Each structure stands twice: as C-alpha cells, then as structure tokens.
A protein has these predicted regions:
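Hydrophobic membrane-insertion alpha-helices, especially the h-region
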Residues: 3-16
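N-terminal export/assembly leader peptides and their processing motifs that target proteins to secretory
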Residues: 14-139
C-alpha cells in the first residue's frame, strides 16, 4: 500500500513539474515573438520592413486559425491574434494589413517600399501579454 501511495505521489509530482515546464516554455516563446515585433517600436523603418512584419503577422494569424470578419479583417481572439494598421501622409484613413495583402504586397512594395514609417503604438493581449496590435505612421 505504501508503494501505491508513493507511486501516485510521484505521478502527481511529475504532472506538476511538466506543467511548470510547459508554462515556462510558453512564456519564453511569447518573449521571443514579442521581441520581434517590439524591435520596430519608435524606429524608422522602410516600407520593405513593413512588408516583412505584415507577412509575419499574417502567417501567425493563419497558424493560429484566427477568424476573418465580414469586413475582411482578422478578428481579435483575445489570445494570439495580431493586427497591423498603417497611416499614410496622403490618406485620411488608416489602411489595414489585410487590405494591403488583398491589393497585393508587390504593389505596396513598388509604391511604398522606399518610404519611411515609424511604429508609434503597440498593444498587448491582456491575458497572454502577446502583441496584438501595431500602428505605423509614414514619416
């Protein structure tokens, strides 16, 4: 009976240790992912860099099976979705990454690839602390 109790206790300890390990791994991965996005914050970057970050965010949303709303934009799922918006000097409205993808990355590259932009805002999901939103402005 003591062996049985010790076995159960050992199994419980293994489960707890594995859970803590998984949590630490997840936290480390969030840090790595966030660092990539945060490297753009308050820095001047070219339109070609915007293309790279849009592609990364789009790939992440697809990998995480983020739904697309009726307006054609990804829906915030409160966990791991990400949105990017860009404000151009000559336009009154903000353009979403989905719109740029729909019009064509190549067209964006040829028209805006050499222009400078600055990430002026980053927001995070409350529960997971992952980057959920980035706002770039043409400078």
């Amino acid at each position: 009976i003591i062996i049985c109790i010790l076995s159960i206790f050992l199994i419980i300890i293994c489960i707890v240790v594995y859970g803590v390990y998984q949590k630490n791994e997840n936290t480390a991965q969030i840090g790595v992912d966030n660092k990539t996005y945060e490297s753009y914050e308050n820095k001047e970057v070219l339109g070609t860099d915007i293309i790279s970050i849009i592609n990364k965010a789009t790939d992440s949303n697809k990998k995480n099976d983020i739904k697309i709303g009726e307006d054609g934009n990804y829906i915030d799922n409160g966990k791991n979705s990400i949105r990017i918006e860009i404000k151009f000097l000559e336009l009154d409205k903000v353009i979403t990454m989905e719109r740029i993808n729909n019009v064509g990355i190549e067209k964006f590259w040829s028209n805006y690839g050499a222009l400078s932009f600055k990430c002026t805002k980053i927001e995070y999901h409350e529960k997971t602390h992952r980057v959920k939103y980035m706002y770039f402005e043409e400078v």
